[in-house]
Structure formats: C-alpha cells, structure tokens
Amino acid sequence: MTGTSTTATASAPVKAVRVRPAGYSVVKAGPRGRFLLHRRASVVAAGLVVLLAAVCVAYLCVGESFVAPGEVVKVILGQPSSAELVVGTLRLPRMVVGLLVGAAFGIAGALIQTVARNPLASPDIIGISQGASALTVGAMTFGITSYTVLPYLSVIGGIAAAALVYTFAWRGGLHATRFVLIGIGFAIALRSVTTLFLTKGDYLVAQQAQIWMTGSLNGRGWSEAAPIGWTLLILLPAIVWAARAQRTVTMDDDTATALGVRLGRVRLGLVALGVVLASVATGTAGPVDFVALLAPQIARRMTRTAQIPLLSSALLGAVIVVLGDLLARKLFSPTELPVGVLTAAVGAPYLIWLIIRGHRDRSGGTA
C-alpha cells in the first residue's frame, strides 16, 4: 500500500508556479492577454500627465497678452473665440512641436542610456545630435532651409554619426565607457565641421543656422509638427516593442544566449530607434541640449524601476521642453531666449554632478 501510494504521488502532475516580481500588478488585456504593470511607475506616469496638462494650460494662457483658460478651451474645441489668432495660430502649434520634440528626446535618451548602461550616453553628448546638426547646417548653407525637409536630413546625419561611433566602440562587445568616450570625441569633431559650414556660408543663412543650433521653438507651426508627429506615430509599434525589449538588454551575454535571445540585434534595434527619434527632434527644433540626458534619469529616480520607463521619460521630456520654452519667453521679456539656452543652464550642472558621482563611486567614495 505504501509503495503504491508513493508511486501515485510521484506521477501526479506538478503545477508550474509563476512568480510575480515585487512592485508589479497583473493586468488583464482581453480573455487571454495579461501583462505586468509596475505600480509606482503607473502612479508617477499619471502624476506626470496631470503636471503636463497644467504646464500646457499655462503655456497657452501666458504670453505677451494673457488669455483666459475659458477662451483657450473654446479655441481647442473649435468654437468661435477672440483668442483664435493668439492661441490657435501662434501658441498651440508651437506647444505641440515642443511636446513632440520633448517626448522624442526623452525616449531616445532612455533607449541609448539603457543599451550603453551609462547615464552619460545621451544623444547630445555622444555625437548623434552633432551629426544631425552638421548635415542640417551644411544643407542650410547650400540653400535648403525648409523645416519640412530638415528633419529627414537630420536623421541621415544622426544615423551616420551613430554608425561611426558604434563601429569604433565595438571591440567584441559594447563597453560603456569606451562608447561614451568615442562618442564625445566624434561630438567635438562634428561640432568643428558645423562651425566650418557656418563660416563658409552666407551671412544671413549662417545667422539663421546659429539660432537653430541653440535649440529654439520660435516660429514653429503645424508644418514643423507634421514630420515629427508622423514619425512618432509610425514608430509607435517599435516604441512599444522597445519598452519590453529593455529587460533583455540588462542580461549578460551568457544568460541571453541560454534563453535564445539575440542580444546584439536587440541592442542594435534599440540604438537605431533612439537615433532616429533624436535626429528627427534635432531637425525639428535644433539640438535642445540635455533633455535626453535629464528626462530618463529623473524618470528612473522617480519610479525606482530597474529599467528606465519610456512613458515617464517621454512625459518628462515634454514637460522640460514646454516649461523651458514658457520660461524662456517670459523670464527676460520682451527678449525671447531659445529654449536650448534654458535646458543647457539646468543640464550642465547635472552633467557635472553625474561625472563627479561616477568618479567617487569608482574610487570608493574618496575624492
């Protein structure tokens, strides 16, 4: 009896136990679909949506002339309003461009920092934005000044720069420090090329290019919003894939190989997506410095997740650009500063802090 009972027990099917990571909730999507949702990241994203909405309302209301929130709502809903010219023609399209540019920079920075595993691996530090700028400024000096064409030229320049950095940094693998240092070297070289174009071009065109290089939303309208808007819409499935693929990038090569994950292709796909987004954003508003550096790191600290959350990073990027442009318009009124000046003033000290902290971590806490 005992032997029979033991055999029956041993042959009984064993149910698989699913372990849910701490801090996550299971959300049902249809009869069969389920996915994990990080609770803190969801709360942070909801809070950022509210903050972004408040910033957008302030952006549309505040300017040389104040517009009541009720009039802003009328314009957005398409109802007759005396503020149609100020809000609908001037402020709203400029704000939409800022939202799209900030979101693109935020996602691009998150993807590239994830692959490089280095908070300094921002598109505007490792040469991607400089490559986009060099080709764009070169095109402007030859008479191509249409903002509907420049974003696509920026993509070509950004991809070319990223390919060079990736090729020179690859030595049987992608080492984070080597990737960043080679990127900084290319950024310096490409900035010199851009300066050469400025000195050889027509004075008026060079002046226009110089303003563009500081990162500005001045004069941006619906025609500038269309290219980057369509790009984000077309790349939305790739962005959703990237949000899931981020987890595999944090694996070591042996673990990824054992699980059948082609880690090299995943990394290349994430970098390519980040390069395209950063380049299109650069072509639309110029190199708005440090947005791609700030947004992902702040998002990660707010959510406390292992990976940089793309949604929170995109929302923070949009908040930084739109709020920065609002402050740039009002702080020194009637003089209007480019938004890139304000983001650089905030981002540069943060970059210095990151470098100092990294040095202290490597030296065991000693200066």
Please report, for each region that a protein language model flagged, where it lies by residue.
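Alpha-helical transmembrane segments in inner-membrane proteins
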Residues: 2-367
